[in-house]
Amino acid sequence: MTFPDIVPELKSRMPDLRGRLLANESLAPLTWFRVGGPAQALFTPADEDDLAYFLSHLPEEIPVCCIGVGSNLIVRDRGLPGVVIRLPPRGFGEITIDGDAVHAGAAALDKRVAEAAAAASISGLEFYFGIPGTIGGALRMNAGANGSETRDVLVEARALSRRGERMTFDNFAMAFDYRSSGIDPSVIFTGAMFRGRIAEPQAIRARMNEVQAHRETVQPIREKTGGSTFKNPPGQSAWKLIDAAGMRGHRVGGAQVSDMHCNFLINTGEATARDIETLGESVRERVKRHSGVDLQWEIKRIGLG
């Protein structure tokens, strides 16, 4: 699908824009599933000031969506109308240390934040080592693993409103819940401050190595996948419910339920976004019939089907 080109009009409104603004840019290469249609406009800001300028001059009727590295995302096949914003590491990926505090931009990889904390002998962020996303996504969904979550270590988050106004949220204001936060979807996170505790670096590194070894053993990390597909229901594991329903290895087109971990869907090579989403809905339907549990998507699905 090709959208009407809105880029010339937007550029005329924003003569001082420094970031890159492209029309009808494919989003498939920007997602781990490697599927999906184009963005009507794709904006890569130079830095936070540039993003604030862009948002303050963007007509309110134009929808906005922000993506990270695309590790927890299905972009539907017909793409997204409006503007998709992708925060680059340059300008949004800096990580700094201040005592037992870690400051990270929204485009910083979770794994790099864990590594920076470990190098500074700061414990508490080891769980990020096994999460294949960015800090912006971690803030949005209260990312967690191995019994720890973002809300356990967050002090405050920085953000911009849809109109480009700067905002700050403390831990309480984030209204975290399991794999979610209470912040309006129109808000774009730009960075965060975390606090850990000083500990022996060897012990921190050992825990991170355990996280990585476990992940390589039980997750299909070398496949085209979006990570955990469904949230774990209270007191239960999604993968066990999926396995019990007989869906391990089940396929729709080029999409497959991973044989290695049932809560991972994979693109075997030629899948469409429709294949993957249809497979996910088939899993939900089968689990509902088998166990009565209504699995909820953890992976974000956006765009026109």
Swiss-Prot record:
Q: Report the active site residues.
A: R179, S228 (proton donor), E298
Ranges where the FAD-binding PCMH-type domain occurs = 35-214
The cross-references to PROSITE patterns, in alphabetical order and at most eight, read: FAD_PCMH (PS51387)
Q: Which organism is it from?
A: Nitrobacter winogradskyi (strain ATCC 25391 / DSM 10237 / CIP 104748 / NCIMB 11846 / Nb-255)
The GO annotation for biological process reads:
cell division; cell wall organization; peptidoglycan biosynthetic process; regulation of cell shape
**Which InterPro entries does the record match to this protein?**
FAD-bd_PCMH, FAD-bd_PCMH-like_sf, FAD-bd_PCMH_sub1, FAD-bd_PCMH_sub2, MurB, MurB_C, MurB_C_sf, Oxid_FAD_bind_N
Protein name in the entry: UDP-N-acetylenolpyruvoylglucosamine reductase
Q: Which gene carries the instructions for this protein?
A: murB
Enzymatic reactions: UDP-N-acetyl-alpha-D-muramate + NADP(+) = UDP-N-acetyl-3-O-(1-carboxyvinyl)-alpha-D-glucosamine + NADPH + H(+)
Q: Which Gene3D superfamilies match?
A: 3.30.465.10, UDP-N-acetylenolpyruvoylglucosamine reductase, C-terminal domain (3.90.78.10), Uridine Diphospho-n-acetylenolpyruvylglucosamine Reductase, domain 2 (3.30.43.10)
